[in-house]
């Protein structure tokens, strides 16, 4: 359900760091919202053509994270989520916390289709999951079962 896009300079992160960041963001989202890990998509983009600037100076040691998430969660939950992602990514990437930018964009669940179905509002995941075809439920359980923290 959430999609987090991390924009990083090319060759800034190792493959292991990218894997750790994806795991950390997935974990933090689930921890904050209760959403199962198979809902969390993390994209790490390295672009040779994109140049980012701050104050007209190249910003070569910054990481930008944009999370498109379902609307309906309190500001307190969103604030904790952003700060925990910032701290985790800072530690993994070995950059200052001030170099991590996190933006959450709240989308209405009815404006999102994933796995072929319009998404439920927060707190209605179980009913949504139970309404899915058995084959899709099995597929999603398989994704979540790869993590020790799987729950629905």
Residue ranges, per PLM feature:
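A domain-level signal for the structural core that forms small-molecule/cofactor-binding pockets
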Residues: 1-152
């Amino acid at each position: 359900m959430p999609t987090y896009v991390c924009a990083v300079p090319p060759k800034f992160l190792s493959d292991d760091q990218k894997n750790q960041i994806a795991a950390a963001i997935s974990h933090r989202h689930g921890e904050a919202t209760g959403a199962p890990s198979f809902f969390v998509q993390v994209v790490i983009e390295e672009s040779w053509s994109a140049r980012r600037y701050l104050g007209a100076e190249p910003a070569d040691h910054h990481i930008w994270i944009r999370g498109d998430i379902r609307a309906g969660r309190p500001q307190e939950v969103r604030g904790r989520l952003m700060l925990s992602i910032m701290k985790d990514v800072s530690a993994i990437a070995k950059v200052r916390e001030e170099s991590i930018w996190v933006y959450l964009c709240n989308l209405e669940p009815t404006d999102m289709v994933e796995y072929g179905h319009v998404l439920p509002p927060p707190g209605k995941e179980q009913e949504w999951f139970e309404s899915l075809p058995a084959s899709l439920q099995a597929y999603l359980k398989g994704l979540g079962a790869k993590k020790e923290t799987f729950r629905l």
